[in-house]
Amino acid sequence: MQVYVDYRDVNSISNKKTLAYVNNFVINTTQFLNRFNYLCEQKLCDISNHLQKLEITMSLLEIKLGSIDGLESLPSSANVPVHNTQPTTQQNTPPPPTAAATTSSNIPPPPPPPPPPMTGVPPPPPPPPPPPISKSNIPPPPATQQNTQESDDDDEDNNNNDKNNNNRDDEDDDDETSSQAPPPPPMPTLPSSQSLMDNLAAVLAMKKQQRNPQPPQPQPQSPSPQPPPPPTTTSSIPVPPPPFSGANNNSDDDDDDDEGPSLSIPAPPSMMVMSGNNNSNSNSYSNNNNNKDDDDDDDDDDDDDDNSISIPKPPQMDDIMIPAPPTDLFIPAPPSIRNYDDADDDDDDDDESW
């Protein structure tokens, strides 16, 4: 129920309030429209971006499909779903002929329709092919081609005979090979005594090389300037005289024993002077076999090979002169202390027995 209001009794609104109301309404409406416009533009931008991505994806898909060979030759109805295409009996059966049609035309009535196929039963097999035409039913060829046909028949007969003969020969060979026993395996070949001796000699040679390795060859020395050699003497250094020792003096009055041994220094051995003229035998030394040694090694291995180790000659050097020791060196003997006139109780006979 609507309440009736009489606006004549209501006080009028002032112009200022009316203006304020209208301004608020316009401002709110404008803000709403601006907001709606902004949202619509944002949605349109998103939709355009999605459409652009979809176009790019479709172009890539077209490129990939275009790179596949033989895709265009496929039938266009390959993706169409296959429905049941078996004809129904109601659609295939023609309508029954009327009596007027049968009486007016002399055409015999059509045969009765075949029974409907049962589900799950395979269809009947197709009829067999017609029998091949025999040679008797073939009409004779013309006279111009009779000779060529006869020659071809002869060639075929000859080929068939050759094939039959080859098959018989193969069967005979198979029978013969099956009847024969397999050949015995070959006897193993034993190594000969000569090859064993050669192998033994090679092993012994390797052992000798390991025992007597070849010394490294000295590298040639570069020539260096040498001073002129001093005059050499072929004679040896004279032996110095023995040191002077005092004669035994038994007539002295001291109590020392003059028969005591005197201390003397022996003469040094004569020094050999090295000269440039050396015997040719010093250039190399041969390693002779000694079968009379007391060691337990097998000297027969050394007799098998007369290899000798050659030692190279040392480089020539200047003569070395060694001076003789001094001859005036004399060391006196220590004095012996004895007292025969002592008053002790020891036995002096022990001292006299010296």
UniProtKB/Swiss-Prot annotation:
Q: Where is the composition biased (Low complexity)?
A: 277-290
Q: Where is this region: Disordered?
A: 76-354
What does the entry list under GO cellular component?
phagolysosome membrane; WASH complex
Residue ranges under compositional bias (Pro residues)?
Answer: 107-143, 213-244
Pfam families per the UniProt record, alphabetical: CCDC53
* Top-level division of the source organism's lineage: Eukaryota
Acidic residues bias locations: 150-159, 251-260, 293-307, 342-354
Cite the InterPro entries for this sequence: WASHC3
Which biological processes are named by the entry's GO terms? actin filament polymerization; exocytosis; phagosome reneutralization
User: Which PANTHER family does the record match to this protein?
Assistant: PROTEIN AD-016-RELATED (PTHR13015), WASH COMPLEX SUBUNIT 3 (PTHR13015:SF0)
Which protein family is named in the record? Belongs to the CCDC53 family.
Q: How does it assemble?
A: Probable component of the WASH complex.
The identity of this protein, by name, is WASH complex subunit 3
Per the UniProt record, the source organism is Dictyostelium discoideum (Social amoeba)
